[in-house]
């Protein structure tokens, strides 16, 4: 679902900022620093109201680089206290998305390091708080699709930052590396739609860094690749898959997914774009437009 999302930024010091976030923002040991970070988030909500937004994403880089540098429990307590004040400022129709990340910029510990801490904090804050899944923010080889299923089951899936990665938070174009993983994630989303899962209403966003390509072209390409994964997931025969699962037929269950994944849906996507008034070949169309500007 399309949502006008506001992202706060307390992981960088801004010009004319009174206090530095070098040692944390919402979890800083200094109350003055925490209050500054809280105020920034509340201001983001106010700007969001002007822009017609309905959600605030909170990602912090707070953490530590050396053992003993930070008291794990006290840091999380400060995070919850700060977030609760932000939560109280949310309009009735807004949601608060808590974004986790395994490491970077902190390399020994990160306060909100994984989906477990994120969802525990979301449960503590209240029903308007949910966990955001950025595909590059997990530990290597983590089963992201199962995390998605768990968050859906407990009505705590906020949405996604779609991207791709090889080593960490690489923010590469969607579908450029792990296309099967992306398909499996979308398969869980389609399954939730199929089951009419309670509280299922995720936000879909792209969060990427384009250093060697035209950013517009990369965003176009990424959008197409996410659509491709979604369409392939729609082709999965849910009844057959459930039957194989009930019979403990692991091979055929896997093959049922691969049958959909290996299907070329490019013609369907092109037809969809044409019927929607879009370009059959988006990249070629965009490049042709550049010739006349």
Question: How should these model regions be labeled?
Answer:
Residues 14-35, 60-73:
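Surface-exposed, active-site-proximal loop segments in enzymatic domains
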Residues 46, 53-54, 68, 80-95, ...:
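Histidine-acidic metal/acid-base catalytic patches
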